[in-house]
Amino acid sequence: MAYGTKGPGMTGYDVLDDFRQAFIVMKNEITKYARGKKLIIFAALTALILAVVTAALTIWGDGLGDNSNNLSYLYIMIMSLLVLVAITLFASTALVSEFEERTALILFTKPIRKWSIFLGKFLASLIVTVGFVLIYYAVVITLCLIGPGYVDGAIFVSLGLSVCYTFGCAGIGFLISSVMKKSSTSSILTFFTLALLLNMVLSVIMIAAHIEDPWFVLTYAANDILYVLDPMQTAHAARAATVMIVWGIASALVSYFLFRKRDF
């Protein structure tokens, strides 16, 4: 789906109409995901991971066990990677595709502001990714009820942190997408940044600055997604959530201003 921008002679500004257009962009993006292969591929990957972990516990372990947190930990330890893959698929190409395909000059019913395009695409990628996160946690919670027979409240804290981490990663994905010229390059760089680059920067900071607790780094804060499920670890859930949200807001704002300055 392609979108256009308001022409220079159009001075009217209707906030409600801009939100309506953003909603249309969001629906079109989600429809595009559903009709394409990305949604199917990621759904299959998510189902495969759940199946493999469950099979491994059944065949080589003690089944689902009797401890809800231990069981949750085994499934949630892959969550950061799942979010990373989802952001690479759904967020990293959202903005760059408009420039790469040269389709953003096409109008649907009337011109549309760039911020409506940005907001619609951001919400679409966020909703799809968070949707998968919720489904994944719902399955884990169900397995906890089937196996141990109860659900510890820590898993809901972990869920909240996973949603915050998704938001933070989406901001990074859009930031990279706003300056790239090719979708493939944007996807690779997004994956590399979230999987390796931030961790490399984290290591340098810890060594060079002698900082033992770099709580302000996005990927470091993501550790609390698991730590809240492990009584042997010290988790700072509120701080981690704040760090993730700040990363998401800051990177999203920067990516919007970069996107707004680019010409279609």
Residue ranges of model-derived segments:
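Junction motif at the cytosolic side of a transmembrane helix
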Residues: 2-6, 246-264
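Short hydrophobic, aromatic-rich alpha-helical segments embedded in or entering the lipid bilayer
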Residues: 21-24, 209-230
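A cytosolic-side transmembrane-helix exit/cap motif
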Residues: 155, 174-177, 204-214
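Secretory targeting signals
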Residues: 13-15, 43-94, 118-192, 198-199, ...
